[in-house]
């Protein structure tokens, strides 16, 4: 299933390019696609499904794109949630499509970022989709560790973890900062091999400038829940 989902991701990104849609892989499949050493050496873990993202303004093209690629739509789900998420089923398995915004425990606006790479989100965005998980599991930890093991920490755009960009995400978002730094602590605790970069990112987020909304929310702290749980998202 792992290799078939990898193939499906490449097929869908290619079909998207042909139709002018910047469809990009994320999740475990996207992480593996962005980590060439791990992808070449294997073995790959089994993936349950494929997550992809498309720009908000491409939402109307998505059903036709997937139909052309041989997928069946989850019509009920898509009718109810299609403005932000869609689900399709094909020979390789289930594909979950995020429209513009990645919305799980926290919201990440992906639309302006989808044109930066050809097949996946950037390493920085892939990492943040893992760091925003509150109830982090071992797969999330391992995915984050894989990204940290194959990408340097730098400032500015490029094929690395962009500390400046990550800092902008938490500038006015205390909740995302709280979750991301907490998850980095879990990664550092469970994976000695990437503890140093995990702690370095946490330190960068801690020391980065913060906006007024961040400071106001920080006063409330953990007395009020700062995240959503995916199954509670309407």
Sequence positions of predicted segments:
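Short N-terminal helix-initiation segments at or just after the protein's N-terminus
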Residues: 1, 60-70, 114-116
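The feature captures the alpha-helical scaffold/lid subdomain characteristic of nucleotidyltransferase
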Residues: 1-25, 37-46, 99, 103, ...
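Short gly/ser-rich anion-binding loops that grip negatively charged ligand groups
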Residues: 2, 52, 56, 87
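Short glycine-enriched loops at secondary-structure junctions
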Residues: 28-32
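Active-site-proximal flexible loops/turns
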Residues: 34, 56, 129
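Catalytic metal-binding acidic patch
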Residues: 37-62, 66, 144
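Conserved catalytic core of two-metal-ion nucleotidyltransferases
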Residues: 63, 67-106
């Amino acid at each position: 299933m792992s290799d078939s989902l990898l193939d499906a991701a490449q097929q869908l990104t290619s079909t998207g390019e042909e139709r002018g849609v910047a469809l990009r892989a994320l999740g475990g499949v996207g992480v593996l696609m962005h980590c060439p050493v791990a992808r070449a050496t294997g073995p790959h873990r089994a993936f349950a499904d494929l997550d992809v993202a498309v720009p908000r303004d491409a939402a109307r093209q998505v059903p036709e794109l997937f139909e052309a690629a041989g997928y069946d739509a989850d019509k009920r789900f898509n009718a109810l949630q299609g403005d932000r998420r869609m689900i399709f089923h094909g020979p390789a398995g289930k594909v979950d499509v995020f429209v513009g915004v990645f919305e799980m425990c926290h919201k990440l606006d992906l639309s302006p970022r989808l044109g930066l790479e050809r097949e996946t989100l950037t390493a920085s965005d892939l990492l943040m989709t893992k760091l925003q998980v509150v109830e982090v599991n071992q797969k999330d930890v391992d995915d984050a560790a894989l990204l940290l093991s194959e990408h340097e920490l730098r400032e500015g755009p490029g094929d690395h973890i962009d500390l400046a960009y990550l800092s902008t995400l938490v500038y006015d978002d205390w909740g995302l900062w709280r979750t991301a730094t907490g998850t980095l602590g879990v990664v550092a605790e469970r994976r000695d091999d990437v503890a140093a970069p995990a702690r370095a990112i946490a330190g960068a987020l801690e020391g980065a400038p913060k906006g007024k909304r961040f400071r106001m929310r920080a006063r409330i702290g953990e007395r009020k829940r700062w995240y959503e749980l995916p199954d509670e998202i309407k």
